[in-house]
């Protein structure tokens, strides 16, 4: 079954909702954005997450030192990196890694040392999907996440199109820029039970 990552959580209530609804991954954004949390805030929220739900730290062009500090302070299970990735960034990390790839039309998939790939829209967090026809995932060495403009109305179609390891959502479970607990529940329900579209 396709796994679910709910990203950009910053409150106790949102974390508890995502966990209770069946999220497999919880994402904390450490890169500058409206969803950014500090290491200290994430460490407190991480205490609410059971061991079978994985904690993911999201970074943009980080140094290896930044990754190691966050892994240690928050107890991250995975790091997700957007932007520039040094050749040795993922070597011998104490946790798994996800490299984000912006799907911009050239169809290029990088040769990555990361454990997972995540395919996102050209502007991450914009709520806009990329053109699914521009991405060919056949022959990929790594399992992959699909992100970029997913919501409760299109996520089942995305799963049918790509058969991904996991789907990732942030703005698609928000209302007026804040995490919407009902949207979180409905999104996860659609993924887990294959219910497509609104009635």
UniProtKB/Swiss-Prot annotation:
Pfam families: PRAI. InterPro entries: Aldolase_TIM, PRAI_dom, RibuloseP-bd_barrel, TrpF_fam. Pathway: Amino-acid biosynthesis; L-tryptophan biosynthesis; L-tryptophan from chorismate: step 3/5. It catalyses: N-(5-phospho-beta-D-ribosyl)anthranilate = 1-(2-carboxyphenylamino)-1-deoxy-D-ribulose 5-phosphate. CDD domains: PRAI. One of its GO terms (molecular function) is phosphoribosylanthranilate isomerase activity. Its EC number is 5.3.1.24. Gene3D superfamilies: Aldolase class I. The keyword Lyase does not apply. One of its GO terms (biological process) is L-tryptophan biosynthetic process. Keywords: Amino-acid biosynthesis, Aromatic amino acid biosynthesis, Isomerase, Tryptophan biosynthesis. HAMAP family: PRAI. Belongs to the TrpF family. This is N-(5'-phosphoribosyl)anthranilate isomerase. It comes from Streptococcus pneumoniae serotype 4 (strain ATCC BAA-334 / TIGR4).
């Amino acid at each position: 079954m396709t796994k679910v990552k709910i990203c950009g959580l910053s409150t106790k209530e949102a974390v508890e909702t995502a966990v209770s609804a069946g999220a497999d991954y919880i994402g904390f954004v450490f890169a500058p954005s409206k969803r950014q949390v500090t290491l200290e805030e994430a460490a407190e929220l991480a205490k609410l997450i059971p061991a079978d739900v994985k904690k993911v730290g999201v970074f943009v062009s980080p140094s290896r030192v930044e990754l190691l500090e966050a892994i240690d302070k928050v107890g991250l299970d995975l790091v997700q990196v957007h932007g520039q990735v040094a050749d040795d960034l993922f070597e011998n990390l104490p946790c798994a890694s996800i490299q984000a790839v912006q799907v911009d039309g050239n169809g290029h998939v990088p040769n990555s040392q990361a454990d997972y790939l995540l395919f996102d829209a050209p502007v991450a967090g914009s709520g806009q999907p990329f053109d699914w026809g521009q991405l060919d995932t056949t022959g990929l060495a790594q399992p992959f996440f699909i992100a970029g403009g997913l919501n409760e109305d299109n996520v089942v179609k995305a799963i049918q199109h790509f058969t991904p390891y996991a789907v990732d959502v942030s703005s698609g479970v928000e209302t007026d820029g804040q995490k919407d607990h009902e949207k979180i529940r409905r999104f996860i329900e659609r993924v887990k039970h294959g219910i497509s579209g609104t009635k």
